[in-house]
Amino acid sequence: MIASGRSPSRLPRTGRLLLALGMVVVSAVGVGRADDAPIDAKCVREVLKRSVLLLQKSAATYIEKKDCFSCHHQALPAIAVARAKRAGLSVDAELTGEQSDFTHEYFGGRAKRVRVGEGVPGGPYNAGYALWGLHADGRKPDSVTNDLVAYLKTKHRRDGSWRIRTHRPPLEDSDFTATALSLRGLQLYGGKAGAKDLAERIPRTQNWLLKTEAKTNEDRVFRLVGLVWAGGKSDDLERLAKELIKQQLPDGGWRQLAEGTSDSYATGQVLFALKTAGIKVG
């Protein structure tokens, strides 16, 4: 089970990708089921090596068949692969570069529309994930990232939130996800010129995150992650972390919905959120 260091369904098409992502995240924080025997580190690394390769190959196959950017085949794999690389796992640099170029070119081709608040099919959620993925790939700020930043600014609501446009659970269904990712995108690529603007936006976003009810695992995860990124107070972060920890099931995992069973996506993202919040797990 999870211990705090402070006071504190089967998926369609993307299932294997999300499973692999969950495995990468779980490995990063070193968590196993409470009733399991100790996990052999060499075995874990071998599984992760295969998972990273699967992520990269699946993403490569996607761009052979599709011409649109996706969070599940470009952004999330980019983030997971970058984390795997930092953990000392080998990755295919050529495939990583191809994915980054694909994302960059996709939004570059929509520049005129994007910079005026149009041309992003998935809305703020999509733009936020794109910026996070590009940053994970090591992309420097340029006209494409500037346009995505401008897009996100046009979509920020007076109440401090960014709203989800398309509802395709579990990955794409939550205003909390859209809000956290949009804020992160502005932080990663807003630059010094955008610092004052960002400082004016953050308090509204913090307020929305704290006052809006979280109903699903996705909501709770990105509520916590968003508040971390927004520089929330430690007491608030601990309270939200406890809410997540309370949802852990006897098998050691988490579920997406109250009536569901535990799965790798829900479990992996909770562990990521807790680690992001500085909560000791394992």
Give the ranges of each region predicted by the language model:
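Preference for long, amphipathic alpha-helical scaffolds in soluble/luminal domains
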Residues: I2, G30-G282
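Bacterial N-terminal signal peptides
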Residues: R16-A28
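Intrinsically disordered, low-complexity repeat segments enriched in small/polar residues
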Residues: G5-S7, L17, P77
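N-terminal secretory signal peptides that target proteins for export/translocation
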Residues: M1-R13
